[in-house]
């Protein structure tokens, strides 16, 4: 781990304030692990590089390397092979139904589909590279949403699109759903109209996955 990488073997206690819901497909556990690694590196002044932190992080979870670095990235392999992409100029509204989806079960169901639909990654990357938000939104697709086939997910997608989202998809393995909006003002307006969800937030793309707050 981060301590062992610099010969530090002390036992420590930490407290993590978790703001992301569980079984939402938002990488909450991975974000906690990434924050802990960043904090250890800072506290013990081990000065590990992002590459070193990511090599530790991937052993904890496939999404941890992305949470360590953040930004907009193309993730390949199990998630540890990352390429930088320009962040689109947009905003998101995220809502979560009162149901959770087990990640292992989501992948198991996906694996049972003989010929699942997939997005055209080359086309999507071209629109991301050109900053074409409408092109990005028209080519978004989540194969796990296709596999989940849950009424609650479909309802959340409908509600977001009905509130003005350019596109709406399930996040990761679910069950949260995000809607894409052209700016923060339209996202906030839409969020104010959405009610009855166990979790709701408005956010924007950022260049990094962490921030120290003193």
Feature map (PLM): residue ranges:
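Short pre-catalytic strand/loop immediately N-terminal to key active-site residues, enriched for Gly-Thr
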Residues: 14-25, 166-168
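Short, well-structured alpha-helical segments that form the helix of a local strand-helix-strand
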Residues: 49-60, 188-191
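Conserved, helical-rich catalytic subdomain that frames metal- and/or nucleotide-binding sites
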Residues: 69, 74-167, 182-195, 202-214
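Short hydrophobic/aromatic beta-strand micro-patches
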Residues: 178-180
């Amino acid at each position: 781990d981060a301590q062992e990488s610099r010969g530090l073997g002390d036992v420590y206690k930490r407290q993590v304030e978790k703001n992301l819901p569980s079984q939402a497909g938002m990488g909450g556990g991975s974000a906690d692990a990434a924050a802990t690694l960043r904090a250890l590196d800072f506290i013990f002044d081990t000065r590990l590089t992002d590459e070193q932190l990511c090599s530790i992080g991937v052993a904890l979870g496939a999404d941890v390397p992305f949470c360590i670095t953040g930004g907009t990235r193309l993730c390949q392999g199990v998630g540890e092979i990352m390429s930088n992409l320009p962040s689109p100029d947009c905003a998101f509204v995220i809502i979560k139904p009162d149901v959770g989806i087990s990640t292992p079960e989501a992948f198991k169901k996906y694996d049972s589909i003989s010929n699942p639909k997939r997005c055209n990654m080359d086309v999507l990357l071209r629109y991301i590279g050109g900053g074409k938000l409408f092109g990005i939104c028209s080519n978004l697709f989540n194969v796990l949403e296709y596999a989940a086939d849950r009424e609650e997910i479909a309802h959340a997608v409908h509600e977001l699109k009905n509130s003005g989202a350019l596109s709406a998809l399930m996040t990761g393995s679910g069950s949260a759903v995000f809607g894409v909006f052209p700016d923060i003002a339209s996202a906030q307006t839409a969020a104010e109209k959405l009610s009855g969800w166990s979790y709701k937030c408005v956010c924007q793309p950022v260049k990094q996955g962490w921030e120290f707050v003193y």
